[in-house]
């Protein structure tokens, strides 16, 4: 009897341990799965950002050069002429100058942005359903705008110092008297000569521009997708899935709307980033004279001086290469993001 009691006790103990082990596995299964999904989502966002920016790097550099060009010492009269000039004077590498820094910035920026949007969307949707009492409620375009803007501000703020020095690296040429040797050297030089606040010059117009630019990109794209799936015009949807061409079109439309609304703020941001730089007076001026030092006391002052000395049209300098590059750039980013997530087996998407 004693031996049987011992066996029963041992059996019960083993059973208890097995049950505890099973419960432990079940307890960590969901968080572990969620963590893997998050990592895959971050990776997909990084790949999307890097691929899309590299594809349009020459147009991106041309846009920035036109935005900050000295109106009294015009070197680039247009997009085509500017690209030819860069090819002739700097070669193939000149067309991609600053792209390495841009990729170093855009990969974490895109990863954080896409991930933040998904988390913000889930949080906002949860609160919206709790408030309305409707468990089947979906995000409205306005709520998507809020989620997109939140994601954009978080991502932009986290990587802004890299964007600031990227702007200067992109603008400098082989003839610039003082050369930044790379992103690390540029960051160190700005910190030493201009102080840490200099790394966030132009941050305010960037934050303001995030709302219409990133917010509209996401909300327009997602709203178009939902409408197409629901209405299926011209048979564009197959098995409740959009084709790659349809996704590309949605991304292109979303990108065009966002960049058109926010573009003047982007011009002012770039000009403010040049303040305090030794080469700035040779690139762009704030007082309307080619030899004047570039000085803006803030965003409003930058707007005022730009319009006063160069006219309202100066706020749209570089719009042509930006329009050409932003459509494929945004479209490729969205499509690449979802395709990479499909390959990695991530179940939730931006639209979920």
Swiss-Prot record:
Transmembrane segments: 41-61, 100-120, 145-162, 202-221, 242-263, 324-340
Regulation: Inhibited by pyridoxal 5-phosphate, bathophenanthroline, mersalyl, p-hydroxymercuribenzoate and tannic acid.
Residue stretches of each Solcar repeat: 36-123, 139-227, 242-343
Gene Ontology CC terms: mitochondrial inner membrane
Main location: mitochondrion
Entries under InterPro entries matching the protein: Mit_carrier, Mitochondrial_sb/sol_carrier, Mt_carrier_dom_sf
Gene3D superfamilies per the UniProt record, alphabetical: Mitochondrial carrier domain (1.50.40.10)
A molecular-function term among this protein's GO annotations: antiporter activity
Phenotype of gene-disrupted mutants: Reduced root growth and respiration.
Xref: Pfam families: Mito_carr
Membrane topology: Multi-pass membrane protein
UniProt keyword terms in alphabetical order: Antiport, Membrane, Mitochondrion, Mitochondrion inner membrane, Repeat, Transmembrane, Transmembrane helix, Transport
Tissues in which the UniProt entry reports expression: Expressed in seedling radicles and roots, vasculature of cotyledons, leaf primordia, leaves and sepals.
Localisation per UniProt entry: Mitochondrion inner membrane
Extent of the signal sequence: none
Family from the record: Belongs to the mitochondrial carrier (TC 2.A.29) family.
Function of the protein: Mitochondrial adenylate carrier that catalyzes specifically the transport of ATP, ADP and AMP by a counter-exchange mechanism across the inner mitochondrial membrane. Substrate preference in reconstituted proteoliposomes is ATP > AMP > ADP. May play a role in oxidative phosphorylation and be important for the provision of energy required to support growth in heterotrophic tissues.
Stated name of the protein: Mitochondrial adenine nucleotide transporter ADNT1
Species in which this protein is naturally found: Arabidopsis thaliana (Mouse-ear cress)
Gene: ADNT1
